Design a protein with these regions (language model features):
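Exposed beta-strand/loop interface patches that mediate assembly or binding
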Residues: 1-117
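C-terminal, disordered and strongly charge-biased linear tails with low hydrophobicity
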Residues: 2-4, 8, 159-160, 164-186
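Low-complexity, small-hydrophobic/phenylalanine-enriched stretches
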Residues: 111, 118-121, 126-130, 134-138, ...
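Generic structural microfeature
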Residues: 16, 58, 151, 171, ...
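Alpha-helix boundary/interfacial micro-motifs
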Residues: 46, 80-81, 88, 100, ...
Length: 186
């Protein structure tokens, strides 16, 4: 084989390299990958779902499988594309109408567009939703809603003690379970 043919063969074989993550540099957003034969790459970037005006962050896991895509067959110039199912993790679902993220701690994000359902599951911790000055925080044992005004429309049932630190204003009657109102006279 001539030198030119050998170089061409090497470059072609390095265009796409199946590999797994062996090191992660979070600050630099780079990984080192290995093809399992003893070869380990230099530090290379990993592919993100979005990196423009909308940006996405998910660092590849150690041993996560993927492919190193190398322009002109030069692995040092490559980009690691994570996310091939294999020994490091099986697929989290198998339905075409569901998008799922599952995490090692038992948490998950599941959107089922057929059912029009989005489920966020955490084994413990906090979920916070913020819009400007309004905020809803859900923790293991409490739900806190903070806003300039909160409107509930429809029947409301409260099972348990109700504590109020401010005034109660009603546009209609307040009736207890016996049918009495606060201004009931005998």
């Amino acid at each position: 084989m001539t030198y030119a043919t050998a170089q061409l063969d090497r470059m072609l074989s390095c265009l796409v390299i199946p590999c797994r993550v062996v090191a992660v540099d979070l600050a630099a957003a780079m990984v080192r990958v290995s093809d399992g034969s003893g070869w380990t790459s230099a530090w290379v970037r990993w592919h993100a779902q979005a990196a423009g005006k909308a940006r996405h962050w998910r660092a590849p896991s150690l041993d996560e499988q993927g492919a190193l895509i190398s322009p002109s067959g030069e692995p040092a110039q490559g980009t690691f594309v994570p996310g091939l199912y294999g020994n490091a993790g099986a697929q989290p679902d198998n339905r075409e109408h569901v998008e799922v993220w599952r995490f090692d701690d038992g948490g998950s994000l599941i959107y089922d567009w057929k059912a029009k359902s989005y489920t966020i599951t955490l084994p413990s911790g906090t979920v916070a939703v913020k819009v400007a000055g309004s905020e809803v925080v859900v923790t293991d044992n409490a739900i806190t809603a903070k806003a300039a005004a909160i409107t509930l429309t429809g029947p409301v049932t409260i099972n348990g003690k109700l504590s109020v630190t401010g005034d109660i204003l009603g546009g209609a009657r307040i009736i207890d379970t016996a049918g009495n109102t606060p201004n009931h006279k005998h």
